[in-house]
Each structure stands twice: as structure tokens, then as C-alpha cells.
């Protein structure tokens, strides 16, 4: 009877913690969104004032938006602390769920290597994502119709991405994850240069097929190797949380920069924009080389 009563008490405590986690998430996200919404009008005034002060509207916009992001994160964090202090969720449970997986990552790899790996994760897809944000607008500007874009870019491109994913998986098994990770990053950067050629040629369905084939094939290959790489970094005890953190970090900076793709194109044009996205891949290649020298990927793959 004592065991049954204890089990029921534990189940009730687990349900309370689950409800607490849910409420903490809802309140924190609501605070995050509300922070952006309530600061929208003030942000416009701040951008105008800062733009006149530093004589650079693009930099002023970026600085104000980063400040709004920081403020929203602080608000979300404070709300989470209030929920914890209220007793809706146990602080120990929050530590085990969110803090311990992060501590585990830094303890296993050490601070210097851990930051190197996080930098690699955060920058690996930057070339593809920043370019991809403006891709559809680019196709329309060249004169391609929406049905043509849907047929070539979406349908045919998806097929090439799947093929690239299979190829990336097979090559990772055969030659190792980091080698294919490097190859994927290199090809992703190089294929962005093909869009420069498409800019010069203009409307050409054959060339569009060639460019999409190369771009999506390399993207699929890189994605497969990257997923294998992320999986090898996680601890089996914290797989879900650590992988979720890595996946979020993977798109954070690229998505932020991608939001300014249109402004960049208006400023420097498509040719220089595609060149700049290709050059963004160079630091990634350097990080992969450094990571390869610092830890044994084969040991991780066998773990």
C-alpha cells in the first residue's frame, strides 16, 4: 500500500511538472512575442535616430533588431524564473531538463573545443540559407514563371535533394563524416557561384535545371553529413534536448542574416550577393579543418 501510494504521489508530481513546463513555455513564448509587438513603434523611432547618428540605415536597423531580440530573450528568461519561483515546476527538474544537457556538452568536449563545435554548427548552413531566402525573388526577376519555378525548383529540386541525401549518407559511411561534411560545405559554396552565371545569362530553362541540380544535390549531401555529425555530438542521455539545441543554433544566425538578403541585393546587386554567400562558406571550411584536428570523430561514431 505504501508503494502504491508513493507511486501515485510520484505520478501526480510528474503531471504537475509537465503542466508546469507547459505553462512556463507558453508564458515565456508569450512574453517573447509581446516584447517584439510592444516595442515595434519605439523601434521605428530608434532606427531613425540611430540611422541619422551613424549615417548608415542598414547598420542601424540591424543593431536595433538585435537589441529587440536581446530584450525579448531577457523577458522570456525572467518569466521562466517567475514560473519556477511560483512552484509550478521544480527548479531541479528545469536544471536536469535544460541546464544539465548544456553542462554535459561543455564537460565532455572542454570549453575551447565546445565553442569551436558550436561555431561550426551555427555557421555550417549560412551560405545556403542566406542565399535561399532571396532565391524565389531572383527567379521571378529573371523572368521565370511561377509554374516553371514550381516544376524545376520545388519538384525537380526536391528529387535532387533526396538523391543528395542518400549520396551523403553513403559517402559518410565510406569516407567518414568530417570529410563529407567538408565536401558538402565546399560544394554548397561553389554552387552559389553558378547563380552568378545564371544572373549573366538570364532566362534559360536548361541552365536553371543545371544550377538547381548542382545546388540541391550538394545541399542534400551536406545536410545528410551534417545530421550525422550532430547526432555524433549528442550524449545518449540528453539526445533530444541537445539535438534540439543544435538544430535551433544551426538556423539562428543564417535566418537573421537572411532577413536582410533583400536589402543586401538592393545595395550590391545579385552578382555580388551570390559571390558574398559563396565567400561565407570559407570560415566554415576552416572550422571543419580545426575541428578535425581537435577531436576524434571515429570515436564518436562508435559511441
Report the location of each language-model feature:
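Helix-to-loop junctions at the C-terminal end of transmembrane segments
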Residues: 163-180, 265-266
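Intracellular juxtamembrane helix-capping segments at the cytosolic ends
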Residues: 1, 220-239, 245
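Hydrophobic core of transmembrane alpha-helices in multi-pass small-molecule transporters
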Residues: 122, 203-228
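A late C-terminal transmembrane helix in Major Facilitator Superfamily
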Residues: 233-267
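Short amphipathic helix-loop junctions that connect adjacent transmembrane helices
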Residues: 44-57, 133-150
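Hydrophobic/aromatic end-of-helix segments at the C-terminal termini of transmembrane alpha-helices
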Residues: 46, 130-139, 226, 230, ...
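Intracellular loop-helix junctions on the cytosolic face of multi-pass helical membrane proteins
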Residues: 1-120, 288, 294-303
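C-terminal ends and interior cores of transmembrane alpha-helices
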Residues: 186-203
